[in-house]
Amino acid sequence: MAGVKALVALSFSGAIGLTFLMLGCALEDYGVYWPLFVLIFHAISPIPHFIAKRATYDSDATSSACRELAYFFTTGIVVSAFGFPVILARVSVIKWGACGLVLAGNAVIFLTIQGFFLVFGRGDDFSWEQW
């Protein structure tokens, strides 16, 4: 039952993050949909972790080169997702208010992704690996 509560909480927080992102695009004062390209960063951010999890077999090791490279790529993706709306606002493609809403949405969505891996990545019987 605890896994179901966690799944509902993660779904709710993901919906809040996407709401911030959509508000940054769809409000009448902003009306520009360029910030939606951060959804690409949200979609590809877990991919390095998936690859590193499949490529490394020793779970006892504290660190491996493959896992560290996955952390590096994931960090680059997350920093790019936060930098993209700032660059768009800096060159006046979007307004700074829209940038703030997109950055708030990014923070909530990436914390939701991290929470998903913390809750469901333990390898127990209610794990995402079974899906």
UniProtKB/Swiss-Prot annotation:
Q: Which Pfam families match?
A: Vps55
The membrane-spanning stretches of this chain are: 7-27, 32-52, 69-89, 100-120
**Membrane-related topology note:** Multi-pass membrane protein
* GO biological processes: late endosome to vacuole transport via multivesicular body sorting pathway; negative regulation of growth hormone receptor signaling pathway
The yes or no answer to whether the keyword Transmembrane helix is present is yes
Alphabetic keyword roster: Endosome, Golgi apparatus, Membrane, Transmembrane, Transmembrane helix
Lineage top rank: taxon: Eukaryota
Tell me where in or outside the cell this protein is found.
Golgi apparatus membrane; Endosome membrane
Q: Give the main location.
A: Golgi
An example GO CC term for this entry is: endosome
* Assembly mode: Interacts with LEPR. Interacts with RAB13.
Q: According to its UniProt entry, what is the function of this protein?
A: Negatively regulates leptin receptor (LEPR) cell surface expression, and thus decreases response to leptin/LEP. Negatively regulates growth hormone (GH) receptor cell surface expression in liver. May play a role in liver resistance to GH during periods of reduced nutrient availability.
Family the UniProt entry places it in: Belongs to the OB-RGRP/VPS55 family.
Q: What is this protein called?
A: Leptin receptor gene-related protein
Organism of this sequence: Bos taurus
Q: Coding gene?
A: LEPROT
